[in-house]
Amino acid sequence: MNLTFDLTGKLALVTGGGGVLCSGFSKTLAAAGAKVAVCDLRPDAAEKVAAEIRENGGCAAAFTMNVLEKSSVEAARQAIYETFGVSRIDLLLNGAGGNNPKGSTSRDVLTPEEAAELTANGTIEGVKTFFDLDPEGISFVFNLNFLGTLIPTQVFARDMCAEGGTIINVSSMNAFRPLTRIPAYSGAKAAVSNFTQWLAVHFAPVGIRVNAIAPGFFLTEQNRTLLTNPDGSLTPRSDKILSHTPMGRFGTPADLDGVLLWLADEKFSAFVDGVVVPVDGGFAAYSGV
């Protein structure tokens, strides 16, 4: 029995492929034999990842894609098919996403003292409360994470229906346990998890499996200002996170490789559908006591 992950001959598309986690996803899929379409809003970031894959003997090409504009996704689809000489992809990894400061508060909770100051003055200088959240910022976060998953799925899953395929979404531990300060991101990732299950049921009859990976705490460009100080030291929030993570560290992109390849290779996960897999160093299992 061959127990080696092997994606030889498969074409994988990764959105957000120039980011910290998704660049790792792209490289891992290529190392397992897949041809990879690295897609990102930033063409230079996508090309950097694709070039590194090629330098290491893999097959990859970079494409510009705005996951919030269907016309952009459709244009990328045409370019990908022409570049690789195909009429469909085998694996879609919806990795584009992120947060926005306009959808975040600056405090974990609202204290009675702050509530009294709000009542008296209508605002608190230097403090961003729940009542100061910007609806446009909330919309941006929901659109980027939810619509940024839905639109590429609409465009590429249509061509996968005849022969089946695999879709892997990127959710977050925020979807299981909403974190303080980031209500928009927590809610948006909960939507991605729910949508993953919905898609799994919807596409099961045509042989498209849909699952999601839910990373715990990984240092990325989106959360770096919350977790590290300008000098690189950890913030009090990071200390709190690590004290509630039994493994006592942040995750690295390599920590996601096993789950990614398991979900991508149908030889090992053919009967796995509609699951959201946490990779969090034990964070969700720990009650704090």
Predicted regions and their residues:
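Residue(s) in the substrate-gating loop at a strand-loop-helix junction
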Residues: S172
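Short, small/polar-rich loop/turn modules that mediate ligand/substrate recognition or access, typified
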Residues: G164, A204, R209, F268-D273
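Canonical Rossmann dinucleotide-binding motif of NAD(H)/NADP(H)-dependent dehydrogenases/reductases
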Residues: L3-A37
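Active-site helix of classical SDR
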Residues: T153, A188
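C-terminal substrate-recognition "lid" of short-chain dehydrogenase/reductases
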Residues: R249-V279, A284
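Catalytic Tyr-X3-Lys loop
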Residues: V109-L150, I168, V192, M247
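Alpha-helical segment proximal to the catalytic Tyr-Lys
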Residues: R158, V201-A204
